[in-house]
Amino acid sequence: MVQRLDVARRREPHTQRRHDERAATGPAPAGPVRHDALLAPAPRTPGPHHVLAVAVYLAAAVAMWSHVWFGGDPAHTITCNCGDTSQQVWWLEWFPWALSHGHDPLLTNAMWARLGGVNAITNTSWMAPAALLWPVTALFGPVASFNVANLLAPVVSGWAAFVLAGRFSRRVAPRLVAGGLYAFSPFMLRNTVLGHIDLTVTAYLPVVVLLGLGLLTRGARPVRTGLVLGGLSVLQFFTGVEVMAITAVTVALGALLVVARRPRLVRAALGPLLVAGSVAAAVAGACLAYPVWFFLHGPRHVQGPVWPVVSSAPWRIVDAGANVYSTHTSLRAVGYLGPQGPSTDFLGFGLLAAVVLSAPLWRRRTSCALVAGVGLLAWVLEFFPARAWASLPVLSSVELVRFALPVSLCVGLLLAASIDAWWEAVGRRWRTVSDAARRGAARGAVVALSAGAFVPLLVTYSLPFTVTTARVPAWFAHDAPRLARGTAVLTIPFAYALESQPMAWQAETGDAFDLVGGWAFVPGANGVDDELMSPPGGAVAALRALSGDPRRVTPAVQRAVRAAVAAWRPLTVVLIPGDARPGALAATTATLGVPPRWSDGAWVWTFGPTSRLGPVHPL
């Protein structure tokens, strides 16, 4: 018998045996020590548990979007046909259209037509999601794809976090909590209502962490892991570069902490790590060499930050903000008409208190200590000095507040470990049959307190989301598809930045025309920085002046607009009365020198290749 036990012990995995020896000789930790992500391979998750997680997150997503799926028409109901939302709808339509019509998918002149076009990779073009949703777009239109993407993005992201949480808890409920916090955090909800698919399809971060842990515990095949990592990196690049950059920073922070805390573990796994990294680099390099060059140096690329870099504040993680329930905020202009909700980086005092008070139970677990360190460093990055961040290449385009994404993941994982540890502690304290009642009461208290920790966060949510019907003006629905190919459309108001409704109209009519202007990251006046950082002059500035304050148009503005219209022929100028500002019709007519015609609810000026403008009439 002794001989058999000795043989069995020799067959145990080295990492698990070493861990058991430490547990036997050292002070006993309070939590479930055997299940440590850095000390042993994760247990296999049963298939029904995956199905349960997907079902729970899908039910939550459907509840959030119930006004779309139960009270509206998914092909025509949307948060707003304006702002960022119209931009997202445009890209979902354009990428399949470009591929099916033989156009370059990396550079488009369908937007910012006559002005140089748009570098698709520089923008949030989501080529991978647009390709996956191509059948939906072809059958039901881009608004339907927008709604499907918003429905499924948190499900996929939450499920990935649920799988990762299996490294921190063996129980389903704590893992569901971790995935749920990641999938439905304020960061995710704020970006979901604006349709930022590049920021809500975030499965890449937990999956990369999972792959790294598999290599550290020597439970994964390095070549296969490298192939998976390389393939996922390619998909993520064509989904959202910003999440890819955030993941790289987060993993780098974690790697530094692992090296500092467990150098022997890293040395033991160095071979598999190098093999997997080399394979991943080869796969990603082969697929992304040209797209990365196009992103950094291709036509119409931009350098430096695309937004003014702004640091967050440390206390915002427990401060939901002043306009949580207000609908009259800047969020309306960006693309959401409902209540603003909590700050992007808010989590609430309850969740943080639950994690901190549970620290004595999980602090001896290496994986939990490392996750706490990564979460703390990511939180510090949210209020990193803005001027220093703006000087970093590539990373300067990442908004600092968006490091709330890894923070929410780390808090979710620690919360799962905390719930699991309390459950185990209660079981050890009242383990006999006679203690069943007390054990049940104590575990009921664990459940109640865990749920209560979410209250400060959940009370800031206003659900279901507010939606409206996507309105396409009659002229764009009926007349625009009959325009001759190559004709550009100039709208009044000028389609610029958040005045981007024409982008949605263009997408919802099958990209029947090229649009002058649009909402995209393009080079500004200096030809290097984004147009928001270096506002363009010339025709763009003149059209903005004509649209913004028609009653104060100067002769210089009129000359610039006329020169642009003459150079951009064939061109159709369209003014929708309900969207234009007072005096826009008179100012546009006086500037172009010819009267418009009324067609399908719009004033229209048509200039063919040889058409001439009439005499200008000063205002």
Protein language model features and the residues they cover:
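Start-transfer (signal-anchor) and selected internal transmembrane alpha helices
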Residues: 1-70, 272-281, 440-448
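Membrane-helix boundary/interfacial segments in multi-pass membrane proteins
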Residues: 77-81, 191-200, 311, 332-343, ...
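Extracytoplasmic
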Residues: 442-525
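Signature aromatic-anchored transmembrane alpha helix within multi-pass, membrane-resident enzymes
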Residues: 25, 278-282, 419-458
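Membrane-embedded helix bundles of polyisoprenyl
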Residues: 57-60, 149-168, 173-260, 276-292, ...
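Membrane-interface helix-loop-helix junctions at transmembrane boundaries of multi-pass membrane enzymes
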Residues: 220, 262-275, 355-388, 428-439
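Membrane-interface coil-to-helix junctions
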Residues: 60-157, 180, 185-190, 196-203, ...
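Periplasmic/ER-lumenal interhelical loops and adjacent helix-loop junctions
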Residues: 79-99, 273-276, 280-360, 400-401, ...
